């Protein structure tokens, strides 16, 4: 350390007033490193030998300047005349070109078909000549034909005219469209999740029509017969498919039901409500054990759910044992539990509103209890409720989101009506002259009525009205209140009336009025 301090003290300051000379390659901090040892490259003092240059030669330009050469103009003229005469000589040029052609026309190189070789005209070879010579041979053996060559215009085996109809000749032997249409793999991969325009047998059309200008295409006729088909049912008298109807609804006397789970449109303020129609066995079992039969709770069947045709007959006497359940969950508007606890109705109470005064609307079908004394009041309240449910729609969504669901019960009867019965309360819904086809699949559902249908696709949350007359199944907001179960059955009647529905402009729907000889008590479940 002492040596370093001594070296720093020996640095003399610069003379004041003199312009300091600064080395741009040095920094002010280099002074502190002068005492350190400098490491030089090992080859810094190594002598390098330069390569010995070769023999020196002057360039052409330098030689022309140093020693110019005199050229005789006569020699220049002589060389020019020689070159000119050699170019004009055609005989020599022809000999050269002939030698070139002979070289390229030998067997080593393939000759061009457009050129004549050895001055011989090649004969043309046609398939017809070969066939005729084969037929004319007496012993039936193929005659040995001499090796012949064809020119460039005859190198095809078959020539067809411009207006030749190849499909008319080969169309009966191969039809690619029919082969692709009947392949099971192509049926499953032809669309996202459904096959379009299929009948009950799974084919595009029952007969395969011959292509003719007057006959419409199969897809056009299939679109007129029904809606989209997801899983057609085979080996049935009437061709039904889940989500499509291939026959006229007017020709069907009894409505057809299948297990289905409908779900109302969800909004951020919506919450599920229950609308339950109990059967004697199901209500007793649920009340005693609190556990619902899994076969009743789950309407979904693996694969394809068959659609059963129920022979209708009218109810007689008291409650009867019910054979099947149809669950229709509804999601109604959101209200607080305090408001729901205060709502109770007697007599005309099913038409009453909540504390806010807004009727709860699910669809355009209204199920009401009318008496001779209060029928006019109930209809007046319904007319007021129509103005408030103009913007209310029901969209089908994925049924797995539904927590609280409702059950509808059906039972075969004798006549042309298909009632859905509440055996505990004796309520019978009798819907006449209407055809209802409900699909259990979540992909699509069709509710046709009088040659009209409405399709709701749950995958994309869309709703499509197909015609002007739709059959919409639902209930008003007051349907969240269940009818009090009594031991005395009360007969009810459902009357179908056609009124204007505000779901889609210009479309009509069916309103269901429920009449009873006396009002019944309603309360929250």
Swiss-Prot record:
PTM annotation: Phosphorylated by AURKA.
Modified residues annotated as Omega-N-methylarginine in this record: 316
Stretch list, region Disordered: 114-146, 505-525
Extent of Basic and acidic residues compositional bias: 115-142
Cellular component annotations (GO), alphabetically ordered: meiotic spindle
Keyword Cell division: yes
An annotated GO BP: regulation of mitotic nuclear division
GO molecular function: protein kinase binding
Sequence positions bearing Phosphothreonine: 331
Modified residues (Phosphoserine): 191, 250, 305, 311
Pfam families: BORA_N
Key words, A-Z: Cell cycle, Cell division, Methylation, Mitosis, Phosphoprotein
TM annotation in the entry: none
Subunit structure: Interacts with AURKA.
Annotated function: Required for the activation of AURKA at the onset of mitosis.
Family: Belongs to the BORA family.
Protein name, per record: Protein aurora borealis
Organism field: Mus musculus
Record gene name: Bora
């Amino acid at each position: 350390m002492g040596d370093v301090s001594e070296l720093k003290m020996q640095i003399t300051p610069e003379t004041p007033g003199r312009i300091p000379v600064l080395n741009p390659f040095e920094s002010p901090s280099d002074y502190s490193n002068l005492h350190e040892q400098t490491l030089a490259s090992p080859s810094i003092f190594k002598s390098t030998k330069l390569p010995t240059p070769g023999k020196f030669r002057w360039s052409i330009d330098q030689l022309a300047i140093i020693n110019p050469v005199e050229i005789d103009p006569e020699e220049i003229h002589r060389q020019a005349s020689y070159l000119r005469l050699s170019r004009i000589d055609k005989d020599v040029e022809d000999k050269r070109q002939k030698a070139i052609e002979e070289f390229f026309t030998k067997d080593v190189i393939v000759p061009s078909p457009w050129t004549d070789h050895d001055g011989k005209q090649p004969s043309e070879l046609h398939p017809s000549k070969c066939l005729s010579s084969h037929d004319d041979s007496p012993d039936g053996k193929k005659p040995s034909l001499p090796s012949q060559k064809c020119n460039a215009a005859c190198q095809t085996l078959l020539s067809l005219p411009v207006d030749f109809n190849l499909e008319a000749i080969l169309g009966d032997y191969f039809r690619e469209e029919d082969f692709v249409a009947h392949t099971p793999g192509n049926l499953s991969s032809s669309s996202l999740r459904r096959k379009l325009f299929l009948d009950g047998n799974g084919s595009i059309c029952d007969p395969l029509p011959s292509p003719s200008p007057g006959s419409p295409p199969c897809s056009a006729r299939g679109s007129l017969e029904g809606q989209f088909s997801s899983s057609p049912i085979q080996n049935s008298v009437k061709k039904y498919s889940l989500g499509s109807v291939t026959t006229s609804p007017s020709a069907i006397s009894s409505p057809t039901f299948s297990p289905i789970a409908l779900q109302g449109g969800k909004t951020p303020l919506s919450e599920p409500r229950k609308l339950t129609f109990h059967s004697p066995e199901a209500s007793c079992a649920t009340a005693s054990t609190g556990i619902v039969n899994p076969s009743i709770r789950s309407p979904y069947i693996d694969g394809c759910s068959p659609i059963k045709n129920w022979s209708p007959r009218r109810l007689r006497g008291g409650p009867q044992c019910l054979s099947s359940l149809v669950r229709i969950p509804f999601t109604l508007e959101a209200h607080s539990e305090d408001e729901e606890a205060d709502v109770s109705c007697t007599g005309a109470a099913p038409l009453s509103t909540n504390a806010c005064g807004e009727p709860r609307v699910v669809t355009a079908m209204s199920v009401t209890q009318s008496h001779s004394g209060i029928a006019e009041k109930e209809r007046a309240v319904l007319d007021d409720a129509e103005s408030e449910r103009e913007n209310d729609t029901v969209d089908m969504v994925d049924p797995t989101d539904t927590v609280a669901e409702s059950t509808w019960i059906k039972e075969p009867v004798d006549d042309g009506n298909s009632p859905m019965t509440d055996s505990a309360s004796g309520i019978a819904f009798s819907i006449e002259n209407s055809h209802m086809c409900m699909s259990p699949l979540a992909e699509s559902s069709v509710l046709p009525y009088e040659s009209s249908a409405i399709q709701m696709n749950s995958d994309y949350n869309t709703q499509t009205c197909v015609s002007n007359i739709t059959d919409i199944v639902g209930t008003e907001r007051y349907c969240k209140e269940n009818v009090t179960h009594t031991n005395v059955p009360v007969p009810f009647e459902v009357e179908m009336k056609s009124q204007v529905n505000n779901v889609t402009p210009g479309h009509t729907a069916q309103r269901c009025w429920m009449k009873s000889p006396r009002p019944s008590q309603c309360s929250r479940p």
